[in-house]
Amino acid sequence: MTYCCAISVDAGIVFCSDSRTNAGVDQVSTYSKMFTFDKGVDRQFVILAAGNLATTQATLAHLKKDVRQNAETSLNTVSSIGDAADYVGEVSRMMQEKHGKTGHGYEASFLLGGQIMGSHHRVVMIYPEGNHITSSADTPYIQIGESKYGKPILDRIIKLDTPLETAALCALVSMDSTMRSNLTVGPPIEMLVYHTDSYSLQNYHRFEEDDEYLRELKKSWDSYLKSAFHQLPPLAWAANWKKIAEGNSGIY
């Protein structure tokens, strides 16, 4: 399984992904799901991938080949993030059709984020069908893969004016919550922070399984959650609570 998230706030974008690929209890491997395209002088892109490994690898290989060979259409030539998303979606569909593997089981989805000079930074999610959606002011983050466990903390914390450092910490807590509830998601954890208008992808870190900071984060978050839970107001069966009428309770 996979978990990737990209958080787009006013100050920039945070990208976070796990590196565990699971094809059964006895087939667990490590593959990076974060890919950078940073050779353009006026643009920077990061792609996070989830889904069929063969499809994602073929898609990324084709994207890199187009850049390397100065193709007419590539991530170095598109004029907007939306055009970049359309292009990646088209390549993904082409890779599936080339090998006759369209349909469930061979699908892949992508998070594409970055900035082209003269426009604002953006994050988009590209579906297996090739269409895409973008993050919004109401929901400044997008997830792919095993998203449900890490979503609550993002909903509570992330706003457009959230500082990048806070967004990065929130992404790691989101990842920790996912790893705790789903063993098919796991380290190494990759994180990259892009500062708006910097056109630089230098703020990258890879957290290994035995990383001291990850262990401390997990321990602290667990402790603070338990402490907060025990400080909740006690459940009081107040006199004004609606009583269950005898014979009309619906309880059998």
Show which residues each predicted segment covers.
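Solvent-exposed alpha-helices and their adjacent loops that cap or buttress functional pockets
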Residues: M1, I7-S8, Q27-V28, F37-V41, ...
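Short His-Asn-centered micro-motif
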Residues: A49-A50, G113-Q115
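Short, surface-exposed beta-edge/turn micro-motifs
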Residues: M1-C4, A11-G12, R43-F45, E107-F110, ...
